[in-house]
Amino acid sequence: LDIEGNEMSGIHGSLDLIEKSSPLIIIEFSKYIFSKKDNIEYLKNFLDRYDYSIYDTNNKRKNLDNILIKLDNLKKRQQTIGNFYLIKNSSKILEEFLS
C-alpha cells in the first residue's frame, strides 16, 4: 500500500479480505501516515488483533516503536523510510518469506 498517508484506511477497507486470506501486505511507512496519532493506535491494534508482524526488506522483524523512531530521525525533507511487509505470524507465507 502506498496511498499517500491513507494506508490505515486501506487496511481498514480490506479487513474482510485480510480475515479470509491473511495476505502479505507491502506498505510504505511515512511521516504522513503517523501524523495522525490515531493511525499509530490503529496499526498497533491491527497487528495484535490479526496476529501480524512487521518485517523490513532484509527479512528482519521490526516493531512499531523502531519504525516510529526511524521516522522521527529522518531529515526534514525526507518523508518515508521505504517499504515494509506486514505478515501474519501463523501463515505459510511467513515460512517461505524467512527461508
Q: What spans do the regions from the language model cover?
A:
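Conserved acidic-Pro-Pro-aromatic motif
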Residues: 1-99
